[in-house]
Regions:
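Long, contiguous interaction/targeting segments characteristic
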Residues: 233, 265, 284-286, 293-296, ...
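Leucine-rich repeat
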Residues: 88-90, 109-112, 130-133, 140, ...
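Conserved hydrophobic beta-strand positions in leucine-rich repeat
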Residues: 72, 94-96, 113-117, 136-138, ...
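Canonical leucine-rich repeat
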Residues: 82-85, 104-106, 125, 146, ...
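Cellulosome-associated attachment modules in secreted, modular CAZymes
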Residues: 418-480
Length: 480
């Protein structure tokens, strides 16, 4: 009996003398070492990188060797798995961009501050435990969701070119830079990110964007959405505003006095007041519905693009700093660039769809009625007889063309001769024009009628023009 008790005590003593191995540690590892093998680091190329961290080349990473690793850069090495990254618990910076990763779990790398994992094939990314994370670049992947609720220290986030349908940054209150363009976002709440300075959310499906709380914002880039209303009145630090290709019908910029670059192409704008934006150097407003634009207070402007509008005159007499101008596809009849520094000009106006429609009364048109037109600067006329400021159109089925000296080069212009009373622009005056005027007025669209609908020449279009056309037709019919 004594022998059995002694044997049992001996066995217990042997067990107690053995080193303790936690359940979480691989059977191939001890608490103080990690073997550099296929089990711990299955990706051959990542394993090859890890071997370089083995300072004594014994095939094992000691605690000291692991603790020394705070920065890992394995970008562009065709790595498909970063399994084993969890052992590097002292890691603060990880660069693993331009690889073939499909998932990335960094839940054990709790000291991580900077992560660049862009241009992979990631469908999942776990950074929930990385509460120290300040910089996250995970763009150009295949992420459909991104949990950032615990990353309250995040300052820079670039998650563009993924497949995100939502993005919750309500807890990221110190976020300064957000690039989330080219996703599938239908809404974006940035109200809690009051430190935000740069917001790029273009090419999503946003219908609205509230930036009233983002008073530090100096750059907003939101093209290619479905935004109808954009209020930037609280964003007095805004220097760069790019809101093109939306559905914006009006925008107030009176409070944005430091604005230097404005791009609002392809919206539904009918007017644009930039009189207080005296710091403006770049203006791109093509593809809207402007009939005029006043740039007289914008003496620092260097670049203007206002193509595809309804602008009939453009006064650039005070824009001496202007070097680039593109104003094609407008009903302009002349252009004076003599006071500018324009060296690059795109001003061809020979497109019938956008050409100026000269309303011909009694077979003639007076060029002196055109704002800023100097007949001495016009040459190479076609389809007209010129007598001083009076032109007589030869063939109403053809456009009138001419060259014009802008002071910075010769530009080509076109006029479409339109008979007074031709309200529907079909090339003739008949009862259908009377009916068309009546329909447009009844629908409240009198302001959309062309100038040629003003048959009596009183400067406005109303039922009296329809009546005057009817009388004219009746008189001609009687005489014939």
């Amino acid at each position: 009996m004594k022998k059995k008790i002694f044997a049992g005590l001996s066995a217990l003593a042997l067990v107690l003398s053995m080193p303790f191995i936690p359940a979480s540690v691989s059977a191939e590892n001890t608490a103080s070492e990690v073997k550099i093998n296929e089990t711990n680091f299955p990706d051959e190329k990542f394993r090859g990188f890890v071997k370089k961290l083995d300072q004594n080349s014994n095939g094992i990473l000691s605690d000291t060797e692991i603790a020394a690793v705070t920065n890992i850069n394995v970008s562009g090495k065709e790595i498909s798995s970063l399994k084993g990254i969890e052992y590097f618990t002292s890691l603060t910076v990880l660069n693993c961009y331009k690889n073939q990763l499909t998932s990335l779990d960094l839940s054990q790398n709790k000291l991580l501050e900077e992560l660049e994992c862009y241009s992979n094939q990631l469908t999942s990314l776990n950074v929930r435990n990385d509460t120290n994370l300040k910089i996250l670049y995970c763009y150009n992947n295949q992420l459909t969701s991104l949990n950032l609720r615990n990353n309250t220290n995040l300052e820079q986030l670039s998650c563009y070119k993924n497949q995100l349908t939502s993005l919750n940054i309500g807890k990221n209150t110190v976020l300064e830079t957000l690039y989330c363009y080219s996703n599938q976002l239908t809404s974006l709440d940035v109200s809690q990110s009051t430190a935000l300075k740069e917001l790029v959310c273009s090419t999503n499906q946003l219908t609205s964007l509230d930036i009233s709380k983002n008073t530090a914002l100096f750059k907003l880039n939101c093209p290619g959405n479905k935004i109808e209303l954009l209020d930037v009145s609280n964003n007095k630090n805004l220097q760069y505003l790019y809101c093109d290709s939306n559905q914006i019908s009006s925008i107030e910029l009176g409070e944005n006095t430091v604005l230097s670059s404005l791009v609002c192409n392809n919206n539904n704008l009918t007017s644009l007041d930039i009189s207080r934006n005296t710091a403006l150097t770049r203006l791109r407003c093509s593809g809207n519905r402007f009939k005029s634009i006043d740039v007289s207070n914008n003496e620092k402007l260097q670049n203007i693009e206002c193509d595809y509008n309804h602008i009939t005159s453009l006064d650039l007499s005070r824009n001496t700093a202007l070097t680039n101008l593109s104003c094609t596809r407008n009903p302009l009849t002349s252009l004076d660039l003599s006071q500018t520094s324009v060296s690059k000009l795109n001003a061809d106006q020979t497109n019938k769809e956008y050409a100026y429609r000269a309303v011909i009364r009694e077979g003639k048109f007076d060029l002196s009625t055109l704002s800023g037109f100097d007949v001495s600067k016009a040459s190479d006329w076609t389809n007209v007889q010129l007598d001083g400021n009076i032109i007589t159109v030869t063939d109403f089925s053809e456009p009138v063309t001419y060259k014009y000296d802008t002071g910075k080069g010769i530009a080509s212009f076109m006029m479409i001769a339109t008979l007074a009373g031709d309200a529907n622009l079909d090339g003739k005056v008949d009862v259908r024009d009377c009916a068309y005027i009546a329909r447009m007025l009844a629908a409240g669209k009198g302001n959309e009628l062309p100038d040629s609908a003003d048959f009596n020449g009183d400067g406005k279009t109303d039922v009296r023009d329809a009546a005057a056309i009817a009388r004219f037709l009746a008189k001609n019919h009687k005489n014939n």
